[in-house]
């Protein structure tokens, strides 16, 4: 078992009783001093010998991550045997300090689904991850869909555990050896996704077996011991999970079964007791979209852009952060004023140039106001005409709600709390057997994800979408999006009731026109919204600030 729920009860430490005070005799003091000196000498000698031994066995060069994984697969039974395992069920006894606390059942199914059920005297805790979402159902009986680092780590571990680390590249998992742990004689392999999820797996240099998993996002360390045969492969029969301060739980394997035909629905979140009409809710959300875009042009705001360059091993080679003040203007693109780069404000000279450029942009926007409005109306009419023509020919490229309703099925609609507001949450995936008739449907049919909707305001609170399969245009000659491309968007509710963008994350690997393209990892954050009518005359630019330290001039 490599996936269990992290919710554990805190355990109070026992305080030892005090020892009686006593005064040693002088002769006894000399004997104790001699014994202490002798023990210290032995300790120094043994420590030096141990250090020399460890130094001797420490490799001069670290093997590749793939070689370490291959050795692990060979040690537990070999790739051919592991490849035959489509699903697995493990039954456990749960101990807390050698005291039976409950029982557990964990299940895995390829390519990337896991589920754990922990049953205690006071209730049940269930957690799971599938290709679309990660979720928990705690002792309070309330469902909770994970987000951000916790969700990413859960989905990454599900992809690794469900396949026993076999063919991790097909799951778009990156791997690299980060260190050699001398104390435990283990190689530390970091597995990661381009979205930022990271887990460290420790493999013994002697047995080649997995001995530990370190998870910083969920603040847990899982240790594996007592490997014995179950069927045709080796499985750990003792697993210790330490969540840091909440008491370490021990899981003892009682039974393991394979290929019993576990249904995909076993890994879906529990749906709400009442019927939720997701299609009707999405149509209402769509009707609010035009109004939302119009209101968005009434606010200036700060925009923070973070771009990362990630290599094939998952290492962040370069990170660039830029912050802008943005002034939306009707019927044309917004005016963006650069404020800082990598946390350093623009210098006086450069800030003055940027201020001048922005003022010239405002002046141009004011001069061309009527012309821009006419161009915008013409663009809208042309776009509407093309959409109608493409829809008639069955080749509409615009992704809209009607397309999602045709292509997707909505899984486990449920009610949760999100950002201190009520939310309707549901997973989405392509309808089984759906055949796309245009590029829009082709793209949607390859997406999976999860959506949070505010049922009162009929607004999307959060949207996560990932490409389960690659997407190509022109047979891959024009555009080739690789599987695993991910998109996350969030909106926030202002005091006056309008919803505005809060965050956007894009992670994708794309090839354009055979030779162009690359890997893109970007996060955009919006904040400090200020309401204006959107006219140029309403904006007031602050004078450029003198930098604190000219040496930090970007």
Residue ranges and their predicted role:
Residues 179-215:
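A mid-sequence, solvent-exposed acidic-amphipathic segment
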Residues 1-29:
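N-terminal secretory signal peptides that target proteins for export/translocation
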Residues 42-54:
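Signal peptide processing junction and immediate N-terminal pro/mature segment
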Residues 116, 213, 237-242, 463, ...:
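Beta-strand-dense domains in secreted/periplasmic systems and polymorphic toxin scaffolds
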Residues 33-44:
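Bacterial N-terminal signal peptides
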Residues 51-184, 195, 261-262, 270-447, ...:
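Structured extracytoplasmic
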Residues 127-130, 179-182, 201-206, 221-232, ...:
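Aromatic-rich beta-strand edge motifs centered on tyrosine
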Residues 143, 219-269:
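Extended, hydrophobic interaction surfaces within ordered domains
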């Amino acid at each position: 078992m490599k996936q269990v729920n992290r919710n554990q009860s805190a355990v109070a430490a026992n305080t030892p009783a005090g020892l009686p005070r006593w005064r040693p005799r002088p002769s006894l003091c000399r004997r104790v001093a001699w014994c202490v000196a002798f023990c210290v000498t032995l300790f120094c000698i043994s420590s030096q010998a141990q250090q020399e031994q460890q130094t001797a066995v420490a490799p001069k060069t670290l093997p590749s991550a793939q070689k370490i994984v291959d050795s692990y697969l060979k040690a537990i039974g070999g790739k051919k045997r592991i490849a035959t395992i489509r699903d697995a069920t493990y039954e456990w006894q749960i101990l807390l300090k050698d005291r039976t606390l409950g029982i557990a059942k964990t299940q895995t199914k390829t390519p990337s689904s896991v589920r754990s059920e922990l049953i205690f005297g006071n209730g049940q805790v269930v957690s799971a991850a599938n290709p679309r979402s990660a979720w928990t159902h705690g002792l309070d009986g309330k469902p909770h869909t994970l987000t951000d680092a916790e969700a990413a780590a859960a989905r990454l571990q599900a992809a690794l555990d469900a396949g026993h680390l076999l063919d991790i590249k097909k799951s778009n998992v990156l791997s690299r050896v980060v260190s050699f742990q001398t104390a435990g004689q283990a190689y530390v392999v970091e597995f990661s996704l381009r979205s930022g999820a990271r887990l460290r797996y420790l493999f013994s240099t002697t047995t080649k077996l997995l001995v530990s998993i370190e998870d910083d996002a969920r603040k847990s360390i899982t240790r594996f011991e007592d490997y014995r045969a179950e069927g045709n492969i080796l499985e750990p029969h003792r697993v210790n999970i330490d969540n840091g301060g909440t008491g370490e739980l021990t899981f003892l394997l009682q039974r393991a079964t394979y290929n019993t035909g576990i249904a995909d629905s076993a890994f879906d979140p529990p749906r709400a007791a009442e019927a939720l009409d997701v299609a009707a809710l999405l149509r209402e959300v769509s009707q609010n979209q035009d109004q939302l875009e119009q209101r968005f042009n009434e606010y200036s705001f700060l925009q923070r852009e973070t771009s990362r360059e990630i290599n094939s091993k998952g290492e962040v080679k370069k990170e660039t952060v830029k912050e802008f003040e943005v002034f939306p203007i009707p019927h044309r693109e917004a005016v963006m004023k650069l404020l800082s780069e990598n946390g350093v404000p623009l210098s006086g000279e450069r800030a003055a140039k940027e201020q001048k450029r922005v003022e010239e942009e405002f002046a141009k926007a004011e001069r061309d106001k009527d012309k821009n409005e006419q161009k915008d109306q013409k663009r809208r009419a042309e776009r509407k005409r093309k959409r109608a023509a493409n829809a008639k020919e069955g080749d509409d490229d615009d992704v809209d709600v009607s397309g999602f309703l045709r292509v997707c099925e909505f899984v486990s609609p449920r009610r949760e709390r999100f950002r201190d507001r009520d939310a309707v949450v549901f997973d989405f995936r392509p309808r089984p057997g759906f055949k796309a008739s245009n590029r829009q449907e082709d793209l949607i049919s390859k997406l999976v994800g999860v959506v949070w909707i505010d049922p009162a305001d009929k607004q999307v609170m959060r949207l996560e979408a990932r490409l389960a399969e690659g997407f190509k245009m022109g047979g891959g000659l024009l555009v080739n999006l690789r599987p695993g491309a991910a998109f996350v968007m969030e909106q926030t509710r202002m005091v006056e009731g309008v919803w505005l963008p809060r965050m956007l994350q894009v992670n994708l690997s794309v090839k354009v026109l055979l030779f162009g393209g690359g890997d893109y990892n970007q996060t955009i954050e919006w904040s400090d919204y200020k309401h204006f009518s959107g006219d140029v005359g309403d904006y007031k630019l602050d004078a450029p600030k003198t930098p604190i330290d000219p040496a930090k001039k970007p």
